[in-house]
Amino acid sequence: MKSWCKNLLAAGLSLAMLSACSSSDVEEEPVSELTAIQATVFPEVSWSASVGDGVGDYYSRLTPAVRYGKIFAADRYGAVMAFDEASGEQVWRKDFSEEFRDNALAKNKGARLAAGITAARNKLFIGGESGLLAALNAEDGQVLWHVIAGGELLSKPTVADDVVVVSTSSGSLEAYNVDTGAKLWVYDMQLPNLTLRGTGSAAYEAGGFFIGTADGKVAVVVKNNGQAAWEQAIYNPTGGNEFTRMADVDMTPLILGDNLYAVSYNGNLVSMELRTGRIIWTRKYSSFNELTTAGLSLFLVDDHSRIYSVDRRNGLELWSNSELVNRTLTSPEVYKDYLVVGDFEGYLHFIDRSTGSIVGRIQVDSSGLFSQPIVVDDKIYVQGRSGKLAVVTLP
């Protein structure tokens, strides 16, 4: 199978869109086998719990949220749960399939949760493939309001003051009042003929929502009125077919001071001026994962699961690691002096962020890890495809 066909599968593109990838194409690029490492850190699972039935093999960007002394997590099928942050004891559980069976989900195929969780203003915000967006009381799980958005919700909602926005698969950014669910405005974005299955969440800064688009742009939308302040292409699609012209920005723009950083599939990693969108530098990388940062370094995982450290001042590559190629790595996150990433076999890898060397690993869930690890204080929270929620620490 051609490597770009395989990458589209990893990114969540539907199988129907892959009819152009024939078995007679170039042989499938192999998955890297894990090899012995010189371990210097020895992670442990502090506690774990089960979150419903997990997400199975479905595309999902469900991630836990840690706030208010609790950990909030959900499964694809409608179970939303809160656990005590210290002990892991279950505090409450809400079943969306039961809650909305006779109204919002009556004509759909169950909850199919895929977007969230976002915890803010003593509420939880979560959505799914049905278009359902719901706000819950963080204290007891009571549903405060719900709406049906104009398309599938595949990434976390973003909350800014009294507004929550969601990016839909139909190419719109929709804004709602956080307390009532009243729709405030809709910003429509151009949708190419073929896109990756996924959307990025918006970042918020200085009165604007910064959002990546499916046609290779970053746009800033004014919170108060839903109008675009500017749009800037970070990659101009080229190629002889729809696949090679895909240029989705399926990540949350990373804002650091007066600069914004974004990366596109098939395209570029860029540094932009926050106020105007002017591109400061650009480098050739292809990714649908989130960026993270520490010090003067940006860290990214590309569409082949290669890991990079890049100087955020000028885009110069500091190191790269190809030991985990095609292991369907999660987005990276910084933990102390390390970078942590999960893989499709459920291993959480610890990488020295100054050298790129793998210095530790632990298998958390053999069904695989699928979402970016969450780091709070000295703990790492990960969720596996089976529904296992685990807290990993270094002794």
Swiss-Prot record:
It is found in: Cell outer membrane. It comes from the Bacteria. Part of the Bam complex. Its main location: membrane. Part of the outer membrane protein assembly complex, which is involved in assembly and insertion of beta-barrel proteins into the outer membrane. Keywords: Cell outer membrane, Lipoprotein, Membrane, Palmitate, Signal. One of its GO terms (biological process) is Gram-negative-bacterium-type cell outer membrane assembly. A lipid is attached at residue 21 (N-palmitoyl cysteine). It is a lipid-anchor. Belongs to the BamB family. GO terms for cellular component: cell outer membrane. The keyword Secreted does not apply. Residues 1-20 form the signal peptide. It comes from Shewanella oneidensis (strain ATCC 700550 / JCM 31522 / CIP 106686 / LMG 19005 / NCIMB 14063 / MR-1). HAMAP family: OM_assembly_BamB (MF_00923). A lipid is attached at residue 21 (S-diacylglycerol cysteine). This is Outer membrane protein assembly factor BamB. Pfam families: PQQ_2 (PF13360).
